[in-house]
Amino acid sequence: MAGNTIGQLFRVTTFGESHGIALGCIVDGVPPNLELSEQDIQPDLDRRKPGTSRYTTPRREDDEVQILSGVFEGKTTGTSIGMIIKNADQRSQDYGEIKDRFRPGHADFTYQQKYGIRDYRGGGRSSARETAMRVAAGAIAKKYLREHFGIEVRGFLSQIGHVKISPQIIGEIDWEKVNSNPFFCPDESAVEKFDELIRELKKEGDSIGAKLTVIAENVPVGLGEPVFDRLDADLAHALMGINAVKGVEIGDGFAVVEQRGSEHRDEMTPNGFESNHAGGILGGISSGQPIIATIALKPTSSITISGRSINLNGEPVEVVTKGRHDPCVGIRAVPIAEAMMAIVLLDHLLRFKAQCK
């Protein structure tokens, strides 16, 4: 399994499984003399961690991060930063029945076919629990971007199932509202509808998909390395690598199919751009406008409704997932998406400074 690292100058490698002893990551490329402690990282982990509201999995993990290396007397040294989070609330017995069965819609089948072995407890390496370390690494990236470049990376939930936030709100996000509710949603009326929908799904034992948007503001012009390391290509790669993500849009995304060139092009004046249909990226290079990315997440297949599948011998079986799971994985994905965008932006900023200025 070689796909555990992302980035070139700012590099993040994660390790660990859902029901293992701990999760961990190594972060290379953090410039020296950045003031850093666990307290700078923990707030983002607390936004992602399970068991914090009735809308997410009841699994309870403190997700307390510990910095092992790369920080001395409260500042980064320029060497590798190692971090771990110990797992505490595993209930591996919940997964005994699927040891020899493949959960439909999960990575069980493909991991078994590829490697000939799999950790069936909570999905092992394929579990979204792994993303805790991405959030930890992303918190470092967000801090550096904010303090050294004035770049803010923030996200919000825009849709769960058929319930969408008001289009008018998207143009002027109230970030205080986003942080004031467990859905990370800027639309108070949508929050009430989200609540009703999730309650209904939990009663039925089912799940639902979601859509969320991440915005990076104050990004300078020039980030991105055409042609294969375009900024939008690397963002799509990073965001698509989040568990359950099935679609990524930059700017207007798939809506461009119905637009005409006269509408979609972002006209320019001496005062700047007149619109931002491109999502802040032109020709794979940041334009100086806000970078906007939207991701779609599938409904989790971990539900209590029986589903057809096969076992290791290829025989038909019925599968019911008994573990603790999110009725909508999109809710806790907001800080994960923020982290992945921040990791990509810092990597490209360091590459830009090394080559251009």
UniProtKB/Swiss-Prot annotation:
GO terms for biological process: amino acid biosynthetic process; aromatic amino acid family biosynthetic process; chorismate biosynthetic process. Reduced FMN (FMNH(2)). GO terms for cellular component: cytosol. Keywords: Amino-acid biosynthesis, Aromatic amino acid biosynthesis, FAD, Flavoprotein, FMN, Lyase, NADP. Pfam families: Chorismate_synt. Its cofactor is FMNH2. CDD domains: Chorismate_synthase. Pathway: Metabolic intermediate biosynthesis; chorismate biosynthesis; chorismate from D-erythrose 4-phosphate and phosphoenolpyruvate: step 7/7. GO terms for molecular function: chorismate synthase activity; FMN binding. The keyword Amino-acid biosynthesis applies. Coiled coil: none annotated. Belongs to the chorismate synthase family. HAMAP family: Chorismate_synth. This is Chorismate synthase. It comes from Haemophilus influenzae (strain 86-028NP).
